[in-house]
């Protein structure tokens, strides 16, 4: 794979009804209903809304044989109204349900974590090599008849691994690792290959964006080793709602799309399913603007490990680089210097003049020709044509605005002499990611340890568009371990506070700097038997000030306890109008009436000393 130049991965084509996937087909957009699958009319109407918004596949939960059989009626209801969009059955725990669903849906999703293996209990299991081989044989014995049903009905399948529902067998053998998630998928893929079943799509998802990106990268590598090219379905599970859900999804999915990986995507938002479609479309369309871009002559650094990157080694300059958290630089070239106390930038770039009234908790950047060494907490910012001035200026911190194409021998020599320089990387290239990677890899190849802050310029009028584009542009840089800071500049009507909040949201979604409460919330489906959206809103109202706390809000137990493995507290649907509360992986209280559960959650947080008053 070329780190610096965009091209889509070559994948095999899969026939899914009238809408094929992979190969030379466009990147497909999809969503999932959250209606009760036995309510045919509700499912048909919601599916129509998803399709009318641009959805190309519609998935429905099929928790039992009754639901699987009702897919026939839903399919008829849609086809009778002129819709030929493929339906996808989502199956967990019961392979018999998959057998039935394959007769009525164009694609069936199965979960390797609970297809044959029993549901996850977080118990350590011991196997001899012979016993482990017998477990694989059990999968073969049950899976092959299902593949035969799919062949007879021309039904495609998705092998959908979720971080939250890995089996105890895989967890015991591989641990909670990307390798375990990949092997969980490969066990099933090898059977498909042996049985000459090719209409297979694969996904590996997690709510943790770092885990999700690294695991998909590893999966592609392992498939290449075994001569497989199955198409990829991308998604970040339990991404949440609003700004958080959009940023988290765009960061994780965008990082992979930017490397040419992915044939279909689903943006999982805790909102109405049709709201997911325009977000997904904007993300795909933005990434595809890179197609056919001018060549970037980057050279990969030998110490870089794409599959498991560590943070690039840098020398700390003040509070930037080294072991410091990534910084946020904001611009205030015009308008108010107002900031949100919760999302206060570390540095403000103010162009050619420093404001008279300054915040003592913020440092300032000013153009080098306007810098006064007497100004406290103000630092000079040079452009690449001011190298002589940079040499002669005395300051313990200097900033250098630097495009990749300006990295000549003079600049490299200057950086070697001036470790106090922090680079603000700039790019006007259609593939900014490629140029930014090329720059940081050149720094590594030259043995330079200057920190790098990535400058991202936009002209957006809507907050959602800024969130999607900025997160997509920063994703791979964060997951590659290259980010010492982020500098978002939006020329348009969006307030400075919106831009600042987006920058902090991106760093939190990438798990490299925490600035607020984190919510791991699912989008809901037919298994969710309580009002998810209003519940999330009430929990956020009560807990949004608890910086650093992670709260899982899950519709059901399919991924609940697993995806909440690193959450501090969990709120999980346990039946109609009933909720179970978790502390870490431990269920503390079961079957709480829904109207009491949010208050009980707050009581649990308080009882453990993790609650502070607003």
UniProtKB/Swiss-Prot annotation:
Cofactors (names): [4Fe-4S] cluster
Family label: Belongs to the IspG family.
Binding site for [4Fe-4S] cluster: 522, 525, 556, 563
Single GO biological process annotation from the record: terpenoid biosynthetic process
Function, in words: Converts 2C-methyl-D-erythritol 2,4-cyclodiphosphate (ME-2,4cPP) into 1-hydroxy-2-methyl-2-(E)-butenyl 4-diphosphate.
Molecular function in Gene Ontology: 4 iron, 4 sulfur cluster binding; 4-hydroxy-3-methylbut-2-en-1-yl diphosphate synthase activity (ferredoxin); 4-hydroxy-3-methylbut-2-enyl-diphosphate synthase activity (flavodoxin); iron ion binding
Class of the enzyme per the UniProt entry, highest EC level: oxidoreductase
Key words, A-Z: 4Fe-4S, Iron, Iron-sulfur, Isoprene biosynthesis, Metal-binding, Oxidoreductase
Identification of the protein by name: 4-hydroxy-3-methylbut-2-en-1-yl diphosphate synthase (flavodoxin)
Pathway: Isoprenoid biosynthesis; isopentenyl diphosphate biosynthesis via DXP pathway; isopentenyl diphosphate from 1-deoxy-D-xylulose 5-phosphate: step 5/6
NCBIfam families in alphabetical order: ispG_gcpE, PRK02048.1
Its EC number(s): 1.17.7.3
Annotated InterPro entries: Dihydropteroate_synth-like_sf (IPR011005), IspG_atypical (IPR017178), IspG_bac-typ (IPR004588), NO2/SO3_Rdtase_4Fe4S_sf (IPR045854)
Cofactor: binding comment: Binds 1 [4Fe-4S] cluster.
Record's catalysed reaction(s): (2E)-4-hydroxy-3-methylbut-2-enyl diphosphate + oxidized [flavodoxin] + H2O + 2 H(+) = 2-C-methyl-D-erythritol 2,4-cyclic diphosphate + reduced [flavodoxin]
Pfam family, one: GcpE
Keyword Nuclease listed: no
């Amino acid at each position: 794979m070329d780190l610096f130049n965009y091209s889509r991965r070559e994948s095999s084509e899969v026939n899914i009804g009238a809408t094929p996937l992979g190969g030379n087909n466009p990147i497909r957009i999809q969503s999932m209903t959250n209606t009760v699958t036995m309510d045919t009319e509700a499912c048909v109407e919601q599916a129509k809304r998803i399709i009318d918004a641009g959805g190309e596949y519609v998935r429905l939960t099929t928790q039992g044989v009754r639901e699987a059989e009702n897919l026939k009626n839903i399919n008829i209801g849609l086809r009778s109204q002129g819709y030929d969009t493929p339906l996808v059955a989502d199956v967990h725990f019961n392979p018999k349900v998959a057998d039935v669903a394959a007769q009525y849906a164009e694609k069936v999703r199965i979960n390797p974590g609970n297809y044959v293996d029993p549901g996850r209990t977080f118990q350590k299991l011991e196997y001899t090599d012979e016993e482990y081989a017998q477990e694989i044989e059990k999968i073969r014995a049950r899976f092959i008849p299902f593949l035969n049903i799919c062949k007879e009905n021309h039904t495609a399948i998705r092998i959908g691994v979720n971080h939250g529902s890995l089996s105890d067998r895989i967890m015991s053998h591989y641990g909670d690792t990307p390798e375990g998630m990949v092997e969980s998928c490969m066990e099933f893929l090898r059977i498909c290959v042996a049985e000459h079943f090719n209409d297979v799509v694969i996904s590996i998802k997690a709510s943790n964006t770092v885990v999700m990106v690294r695991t998909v990268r590893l999966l592609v590598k392992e498939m290449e080793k075994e001569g497989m090219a199955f198409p990829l379905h991308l998604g970040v599970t339990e991404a949440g709602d609003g700004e958080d859900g959009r940023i988290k999804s765009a960061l994780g999915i965008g990082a992979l799309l930017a490397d040419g990986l992915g044939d279909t995507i689903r943006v999982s938002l805790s909102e109405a399913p049709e709201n997911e479609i325009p977000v997904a479309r904007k993300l795909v369309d933005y990434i595809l603007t890179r197609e056919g871009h001018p060549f970037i002559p980057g050279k990969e650094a030998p110490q870089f490990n794409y599959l498991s990157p560590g943070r690039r080694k840098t020398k700390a300059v003040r509070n930037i680089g080294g072991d410091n958290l990534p910084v946020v630089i904001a611009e205030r070239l015009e308008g108010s210097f107002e900031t949100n106390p919760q999302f206060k930038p570390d540095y403000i770039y103010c162009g050619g003049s420093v404001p008279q009234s300054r915040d003592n908790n913020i440092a300032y950047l000013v153009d080098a020709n306007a810098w006064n060494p007497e100004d406290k907490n103000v630092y000079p910012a040079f452009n690449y044509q001011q190298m002589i001035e940079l040499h002669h200026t005395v300051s313990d911190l200097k900033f250098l605005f630097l495009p990749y194409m300006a990295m000549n021998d003079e600049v490299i020599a200057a950086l070697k002499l001036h470790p106090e320089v922090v680079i603000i990387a700039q790019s006007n290239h259609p593939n900014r990611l490629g140029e930014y990677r090329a720059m940081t890899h050149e720094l590594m190849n030259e043995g330079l340890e200057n920190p790098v802050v990535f400058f991202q310029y936009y002209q957006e009028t809507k907050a959602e568009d800024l969130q999607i584009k900025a997160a997509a542009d920063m994703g791979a840089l964060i997951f590659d371990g290259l980010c010492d800071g982020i500098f978002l500049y939006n020329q348009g009507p969006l307030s400075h506070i919106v831009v600042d909040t987006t920058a902090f949201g991106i760093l939190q979604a990438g798990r490299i700097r925490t600035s607020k409460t984190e919510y791991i919330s699912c989008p809901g489906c037919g298994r969710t038997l309580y009002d998810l959206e209003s519940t999330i809103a009430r929990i956020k109202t009560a807990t949004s000030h608890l910086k650093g706390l992670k709260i899982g809000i899950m519709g059901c137990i399919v991924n609940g306890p697993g995806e909440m493995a690193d959450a501090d507290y969990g709120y999980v649907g346990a039946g109609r109008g009933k909720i179970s509360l978790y502390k870490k992986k431990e269920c503390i209280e079961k079957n709480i009436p829904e109207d009491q559960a949010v208050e009980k959650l707050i009581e649990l947080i308080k009882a453990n000393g993790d609650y502070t008053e607003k």
